[in-house]
Amino acid sequence: MNTFLLSALCLGAWAALVGAVTVQDGDFSFSLESVKKLKDLQEAPESKVQGRRKFVAPPLCSFSGFPEELRPVCKEPNSQDILNRLAVIAQDPSTCEICAYAACAGC
C-alpha cells in the first residue's frame, strides 16, 4: 500500500513538473510549449514571403497559428528582437528543458 501511494505521489509530481518549464525575456514569461510553436511558424511557407511593406508588428504575429500567449510581445517596440531570442530557444528546445539557457526556469 505504501509503495502504491509513493508511486502515485511521484507520478503526480512528475506530471506537474513536465509542463512547468517557462521561458523569460525581460518582463515576459511564456511556457516552453508556446515558444516551441515559433519553430513551426518559421518553417511555414507563408513566413518565407517577404514584401517591401513596413510592418508595425513582426510578420510572425499576423499568422493564424501564432500562440495567443505570445501576442503581448507583438505590441512591444522591440518585438522583433524578443521573437528572435525566443526563436533561438525554439530551434533547440531540449537545451531549455535541461536549463542550459538562463532564460529557462522550472526544470
UniProtKB/Swiss-Prot annotation:
Keywords: Disulfide bond, Secreted, Signal. Disulfide bonds join 61-74, 96-104, 99-107. It is found in: Secreted. Gene3D superfamilies: Guanylin. GO terms for cellular component: extracellular region. Residues 1-20 form the signal peptide. Its main location: secreted. PANTHER family: GUANYLIN, GUANYLIN FAMILY MEMBER. Belongs to the guanylin family. This is Guanylin.
